[in-house]
Amino acid sequence: MAHARVLLLALAVLATAAVAVASSSSFADSNPIRPVTDRAASTLESAVLGALGRTRHALRFARFAVRYGKSYESAAEVRRRFRIFSESLEEVRSTNRKGLPYRLGINRFSDMSWEEFQATRLGAAQTCSATLAGNHLMRDAAALPETKDWREDGIVSPVKNQAHCGSCWTFSTTGALEAAYTQATGKNISLSEQQLVDCAGGFNNFGCNGGLPSQAFEYIKYNGGIDTEESYPYKGVNGVCHYKAENAAVQVLDSVNITLNAEDELKNAVGLVRPVSVAFQVIDGFRQYKSGVYTSDHCGTTPDDVNHAVLAVGYGVENGVPYWLIKNSWGADWGDNGYFKMEMGKNMCAIATCASYPVVAA
């Protein structure tokens, strides 16, 4: 019992210390806060090694916990998380030996079971009926660029983090709206995901349990607008709607849907219009994506398979493999600075089954 209490205290200290380290990584070694965080990390390391034994792998796990601000309740949980971490590390190593066009890496999800990850980061699968017959008007194909990255145009807002809430659809929605607004006005803006979590249920959305950008665009259109992030900040839990019309910053005039499975339409929209909200099926393994062009023979290709909404901000070719460039909502320390590439041309993981973009008032 005494050992468990020491471990719990050490891990609690770790969570505070890791936050300080994450927010102060550029501090010089002379910073007076540094010795405190180093001592806390040392205490955690000793506690973890005490629970697991002094091995190189246990030390790697302790350093992982420090880096990501982990906090575990008991020695039993440390051992369980260590087992999951070990399995994740083996998956990374075995996948990276296969010569695939992408690579995996250890990240903040590497000590989570697949069931935990699904419950806290993904939404329930929903049928995207709005895309059965799309209304995107194809633009001149001759003007379509060979590659596109809307970040270079300065209209893509920074990567955000949905945290422990299946609200990916709200971040895909606001990402598309923020890009459209900046494109139309030349002004940057951050919009409220929490408003969508709390208020868009009447349009077949379910807060932290999932939703669709196309349905969120319709909600905003009929609601009369969406508040700023500052006026309606993100909490990452389901709450009571307290939208205030006076804080509405962007109005949606209409939404445009890409025809089901039509990657040519999607490429036309991404290349010639602006970033497009898309959804796809996340399967176990993708959560540890690090770089390269993701491809899989195991994910689905129908609207009923999708469980995660994101934002397509461009496309290109890497080592001969065409790809979609996609902004995620799992933080800037995930993947390739918060982004990933998905193979283009095969409706990979149903990426072209649930795509739409908004038209906003300037």
UniProtKB/Swiss-Prot annotation:
UniProt keyword Protease, yes or no: yes
Disulfide bonds: 165-208, 199-241, 299-349
Induction details: Aleurain is synthesized by the aleurone cells stimulated by gibberellic or abscisic acid.
Source species: Hordeum vulgare (Barley)
SMART domains: Inhibitor_I29, Pept_C1
Glycosylation sites: 188, 257
Entry annotation: catalytic residues: 168, 308, 328
A cellular-component GO term for this protein: vacuole
Functional summary from the UniProt entry: May play a role in proteolysis leading to mobilization of nitrogen during senescence and starvation.
Any one GO MF annotation of this record: cysteine-type endopeptidase activity
Name of protein: Thiol protease aleurain
Signal sequence, renumbered to the chain: 1-22
Chief location category: other
EC number(s) given by UniProt: 3.4.22.16
SUPFAM superfamilies tied to this protein: Cysteine proteinases
This protein's UniProt keywords: Disulfide bond, Germination, Glycoprotein, Hydrolase, Protease, Signal, Thiol protease, Vacuole, Zymogen
UniProt-listed GO biological process terms: proteolysis
Localization terms from the record: Vacuole
Propeptide: 23-143
Reaction(s) catalysed by this chain's protein: Hydrolysis of proteins, acting as an aminopeptidase (notably, cleaving Arg-|-Xaa bonds) as well as an endopeptidase
Annotated family: Belongs to the peptidase C1 family.
